Amino acid sequence: MAFNTAMASTSPAAANDVLREHIGLRRSLSGQDLVLKGGGIRRSSSDNHLCCRSGNNNNRILAVSVRPGMKTSRSVGVFSFQISSSIIPSPIKTLLFETDTSQDEQESDEIEIETEPNLDGAKKANWVERLLEIRRQWKREQKTESGNSDVAEESVDVTCGCEEEEGCIANYGSVNGDWGRESFSRLLVKVSWSEAKKLSQLAYLCNLAYTIPEIKGEDLRRNYGLKFVTSSLEKKAKAAILREKLEQDPTHVPVITSPDLESEKQSQRSASSSASAYKIAASAASYIHSCKEYDLSEPIYKSAAAAQAAASTMTAVVAAGEEEKLEAARELQSLQSSPCEWFVCDDPNTYTRCFVIQGSDSLASWKANLFFEPTKFEDTDVLVHRGIYEAAKGIYEQFLPEITEHLSRHGDRAKFQFTGHSLGGSLSLIVNLMLISRGLVSSEAMKSVVTFGSPFVFCGGEKILAELGLDESHVHCVMMHRDIVPRAFSCNYPDHVALVLKRLNGSFRTHPCLNKNKLLYSPMGKVYILQPSESVSPTHPWLPPGNALYILENSNEGYSPTALRAFLNRPHPLETLSQRAAYGSEGSVLRDHDSKNYVKAVNGVLRQHTKLIVRKARIQRRSVWPVLTSAGRGLNESLTTAEEIMTRV
């Protein structure tokens, strides 16, 4: 570990002073790690360094500006996007679970930070502001709580939140059940060749959405008979040109902003100093120091550490105030800050317009994913992921011109197809249901929504399908056998994580899915389970070996909703994140969620179908050929006999 020069040169007496620091940090004898008295902190190699320096009367925590490089590992959470842990330092992650007020009495202590000049200022300000907001939130809560209140004894409203006369929307079943390969495999049905071919085409389009600038209309027409229409990038370019023309127009009246107001806002941003954020780091260190069960000898990738790493990023957004959330919602709905890009193509033969939405690939998509508190969908009682719903509202407005144009051109013959990978699939589903619920497009004109590796975002989605006159076949959810993203919101949430969510945000206190089923959002629609070849990813213990695409058929005898829930918890996302092999460009998280691997796996299933058809054709040809040859010999003999009779006559 890189130490500050002042610390490296301290005398033994000074070292003893360091050990007596009230923040609980001491320097290890080896000089390689920074550990805690009675417990210890092990620094993740991707986090900022925290150093303690003793002065005359100053207690300081320094963040060393060296950024350790880790070529083969990146910070990967339960989502498909990648978040650098430099945005949320490791010690602070622990604070996001529990608070410690012991450091509040030492607000006057001087805290310094050496900033990294190569970091983007906006990114640094982002996590600092979030942390300060959490700190203010907790201070307000602590004032209302008794001084010696315990987390386990905190009064939390755990009512379902559903109207009793209407029934609960969270009837999903428990995770309990004795499921294994034999019992679970009986519920699986292999998809047909025609359906696999359709899914292969849509998976290809979803993968293409990540490289929209490289799309060639000729390739789409030649390979799939599709015509490229437009994309979000073209819309943004046109909007930029129009805005530039308006600015150059002498008759255009510009929006006047007050310089004084702007400077005041800037000074307020500066006031949110990084020093205050590192006070939180000191509190975090003190909290970990007080945890006697924390064992430094245990691997850092244990499930508990993985749980903290996964939930800390979510907590930062959950704790934000309503004003900040409304501002984030407005950003998600704007064209320029939309979380996902998209493109549109037509199938002239079937009058179908296909909308393909990209998955998580930007900071805005990170916001949409983590802004995951429940809210009502379209003035109904059905709850939906708020961040993705807000983003879908913006994409809905962007799609409207293309939808109305297609309807006006083809009338009743017009059809619409929505698809997407990861976050894009969830957005596709919400936009699709918004169009139907608002009466702009009839349900008959909508083809089934197809998602690939997308998180479930509805609590009680079956209810909204029933209200719109749809059945579960309207939604086709394709998930890789070990993909962590579809499991992210639908796995079993540990009690301590659920408690933190309820403490920080009141909407989770009456969230039916969380209170009744210990999950955030329940699965909906038909679930397709895609297993690649063993050379790509290990076989799931509940699936037959080999590359295959199955439908989890609920009409099979012995089916229960607990089967799907049990599958979504095996492996549990925290179990996946607890493994070293989960991280990095070659890690299992990226491997089992990559859109390219979805395309390869579905195409592998198609090749198996093709080989099987060819093999059957060969067998049939070989079995029919002797019959044809024998029939030919009999025909020749009959012709010869007829000739003899005729010559005799």
UniProtKB/Swiss-Prot annotation:
Record-stated family: Belongs to the AB hydrolase superfamily. Lipase family.
Lineage, broadest ranks: Eukaryota, Viridiplantae, Streptophyta, Embryophyta, Tracheophyta
Motif (GXSXG): 420-424
Native source organism of the sequence: Arabidopsis thaliana
Further remarks about this protein from its record: Plants overexpressing PLIP1 exhibit stunted growth and accumulate anthocyanin under normal growth conditions.
Top-level division of the source organism's lineage: Eukaryota
UniProtKB keywords: Chloroplast, Hydrolase, Lipid degradation, Lipid metabolism, Membrane, Plastid, Thylakoid, Transit peptide
Protein name per UniProt: Phospholipase A1 PLIP1, chloroplastic
Description of the deletion phenotype: Reduced levels of oil seeds and delay in seed germination.
Consequence of substituting residue 483 to A: Abolishes lipase activity
GO cellular component: chloroplast thylakoid; chloroplast thylakoid membrane
Reactions catalysed according to its record: a 1,2-diacyl-sn-glycero-3-phosphocholine + H2O = a 2-acyl-sn-glycero-3-phosphocholine + a fatty acid + H(+); a 1,2-diacyl-3-O-(beta-D-galactosyl)-sn-glycerol + 2 H2O = 3-beta-D-galactosyl-sn-glycerol + 2 a fatty acid + 2 H(+)
Membrane topology designation: Peripheral membrane protein
Enzyme Commission numbers on file: 3.1.1.32, 3.1.1.26
